C-alpha cells in the first residue's frame, strides 16, 4: 500500500500550504467538479515513481479536553499513530511557541519517524531559523518555504526514503486471480460490517490476516454467483467467530489506503442521516484516485416515502459530482438490494478496465463534434481531429487537434458524457486529455 505522511502542527504554521504543494499534481483532477468542496484534508502526492498519501491533520491542540478541538486532537492522534512518517511543522518567523513544545512532547512518545520542518524560512539564514527548534529534541530541523517551494523536494524525498523503507513487501493481495478488490468505505455505524456479512455469508467465509504492517490490513476472499472477489478491510472489521464486527473508530488512514488499493469502492451511506462533508471528502478522494465507484444507501427499509424523497434529493445535491456512479438503496440487515449492488460493482470494474479501439473512439469524437461544435474563443475555434486510449483504470481518452487550450470545461464534460454513453462507461471516472498534434493517419489510405 502507499505510505502515509501526516502533516502535524499548531494552527497557521502552513500545513495547508504544504499540503497543496505536495498534492498539486492532483488538484486539477477534482477542483472543477461541481458540488465538491475544495476544503480537502487528504490527497495523493508523487515523487517520480513513488506515490504517497498525505493527511493534513488540522490545527493540533493536544491538551484540548472537549468540543471540536478535542475531536480534532483525537483524529490527529489516530492519524499520527497510523502514519508511516510524521512531518511536524513549526513557524520560522514566529519562533518556538509553547504549543510546539506540547506537540513535540506528544510526538516523541509515539515512536513514529518525525521530520521537524521549519516553515516560512524564505530569506532567512538557517542558523537563525533553526536554533530555537533544537530545543524540541527532534533532531536537525529542516528549513523550507511551503509557499515558494524552497527545500520541499529534498524534505519529502528524505521522508519517503524512511516511509518506503518501513513498507512491507507486496504479497499476494496483488494476485489477479483473486478477483475484483472491493473497499467498502463510509462513516461509523452506516452498516459496513452488516454489508460485509450479507455479501460473504457466514458459512462461506475465507478470511486471513496479511501480516507485515502495523495496521494489519485484512483481505477477505469470497465467491458470489461463481465470481471471485476480495474485500479490503476499511472499518476496523475484525473476525469474531464466523461473523465480522466493526470496531467503529473511523480511520482516515485506513480508508485512504483501502481506496487506493481497491479496484472498486462501495461508498456506503446511512439513509437516515444527512450526507456530511466527510462523506463528500471521501468521495472526492475516490474520484481523485480514479477508482470505480458504486454508492450504497443503507437502512432504506426504515424510511417512509417522504423521508426517501428527502434522502434522494440530499444525495443528488451534495454528491452531484458522482453522477457517473450508480446508486442503490439497500438494507444490508435484510439483504435487500445486495444483488443489484454487486452487479453494479461488476459493471463498474468492466468499465474501468475497458479497451477502447482508436477507430471507434475517433468515430465517437467526430459524431460528438458534428452534433455540437466547441465554442470559439475569440477568432479561434478548437479543432478536434482524432482520439485514442491513453490508459485504463480509470479510462483515459487522449484527444488530438489544434487550439485545444480553447476547449471549455463545459465542452469537456459534454465530450465525457458522449463517450460514457457510447462505450457504456458507467461507474468509473473518465479522464480526457488534450494534445495539440497532427493526425499521423491523415495521409494514409
UniProtKB/Swiss-Prot annotation:
Top-level taxon in the UniProt lineage: Bacteria
All copies of domain KH-like, residue ranges: 354-438
Binding site for GTP 2: 186-193, 233-237, 298-301
Stretch forming the signal peptide: none
Domain EngA-type G: from-to ranges: 3-167, 180-353
Keywords: GTP-binding, Nucleotide-binding, Repeat, Ribosome biogenesis
SMART domains given in the database record: AAA
Record: residues binding GTP 1: 9-16, 56-60, 119-122
Biological process according to GO: ribosome biogenesis
GO MF terms held by the record: ATP hydrolysis activity; GTP binding; ribosome binding
Record family assignment: Belongs to the TRAFAC class TrmE-Era-EngA-EngB-Septin-like GTPase superfamily. EngA (Der) GTPase family.
Physiological role: GTPase that plays an essential role in the late steps of ribosome biogenesis.
Subunit annotation: Associates with the 50S ribosomal subunit.
Protein name: GTPase Der
Amino acid at each position: 500500500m502507499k505510505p502515509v505522511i501526516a502533516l502535524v502542527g499548531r494552527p497557521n504554521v502552513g500545513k495547508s500550504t504544504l499540503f497543496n504543494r505536495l498534492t498539486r499534481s492532483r488538484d486539477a483532477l477534482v477542483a472543477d467538479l461541481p458540488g465538491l468542496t475544495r476544503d480537502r484534508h487528504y490527497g495523493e502526492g508523487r515523487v517520480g515513481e513513488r506515490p504517497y498519501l498525505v493527511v493534513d491533520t488540522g490545527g493540533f491542540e493536544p491538551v484540548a479536553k472537549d468540543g471540536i478541538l478535542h475531536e480534532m486532537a483525537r483524529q490527529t492522534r489516530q492519524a499520527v499513530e497510523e502514519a508511516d512518517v510524521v512531518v511536524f511543522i513549526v513557524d520560522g518567523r514566529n519562533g518556538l511557541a509553547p504549543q510546539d513544545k506540547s506537540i513535540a512532547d506528544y510526538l516523541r512518545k509515539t515512536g513514529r519517524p518525525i521530520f521537524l520542518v521549519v516553515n516560512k524560512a524564505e530569506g532567512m539564514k538557517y542558523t537563525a531559523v533553526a536554533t530555537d527548534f533544537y530545543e524540541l529534541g527532534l533532531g536537525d530541523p529542516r528549513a523550507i518555504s511551503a509557499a515558494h517551494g524552497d527545500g520541499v523536494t529534498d524534505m519529502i524525498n528524505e521522508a519517503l526514503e524512511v516511509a518506503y523503507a518501513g513498507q512491507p513487501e507486496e504479497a499476494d493481495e496483488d494476485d489477479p486471480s483473486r478477483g475484483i478488490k472491493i473497499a467498502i468505505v463510509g462513516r461509523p455505524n452506516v452498516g459496513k460490517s452488516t454489508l460485509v456479512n450479507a455479501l460473504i455469508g457466514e458459512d462461506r467465509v475465507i478470511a486471513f490476516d496479511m501480516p507485515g504492517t502495523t495496521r494489519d490490513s485484512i483481505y477477505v476472499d469470497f465467491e458470489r454467483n461463481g465470481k471471485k472477489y476480495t474485500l479490503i478491510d476499511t472499518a476496523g472489521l475484525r473476525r469474531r467467530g464466523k461473523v465480522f464486527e466493526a470496531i467503529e473508530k473511523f480511520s482516515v488512514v485506513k480508508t485512504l489506503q483501502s481506496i487506493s488499493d481497491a479496484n472498486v469502492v462501495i461508498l456506503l451511506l446511512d439513509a437516515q442521516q444527512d450526507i456530511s462533508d466527510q462523506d463528500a471528502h471521501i468521495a472526492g478522494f475516490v474520484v481523485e484516485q480514479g477508482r470505480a465507484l458504486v454508492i450504497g444507501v443503507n437502512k432504506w427499509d426504515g424510511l417512509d416515502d417522504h423521508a426517501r424523497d428527502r434522502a434522494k434529493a440530499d444525495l443528488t445535491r451534495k454528491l452531484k459530482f458522482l453522477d457517473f456512479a450508480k446508486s442503490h438503496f439497500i438494507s444490508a440487515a435484510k439483504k435487500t438490494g445486495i444483488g443489484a449492488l454487486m452487479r453494479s460493482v461488476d459493471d463498474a470494474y468492466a468499465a474501468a478496465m475497458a479497451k477502447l479501439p482508436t477507430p471507434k473512439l475517433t468515430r465517437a469524437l467526430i459524431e460528438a463534434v458534428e452534433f455540437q461544435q466547441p465554442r470559439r474563443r475569440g477568432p479561434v475555434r478548437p479543432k478536434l481531429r482524432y482520439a485514442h486510449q491513453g490508459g485504463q483504470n480509470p479510462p483515459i481518452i487522449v484527444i488530438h487537434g489544434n487550439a485545444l487550450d480553447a476547449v471549455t470545461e463545459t465542452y469537456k464534460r459534454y465530450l465525457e458524457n458522449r463517450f460514457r454513453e457510447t462505450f457504456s462507461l458507467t461507474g468509473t471516472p473518465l479522464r480526457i486529455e488534450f494534445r495539440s498534434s497532427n493526425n499521423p493517419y491523415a495521409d494514409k489510405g
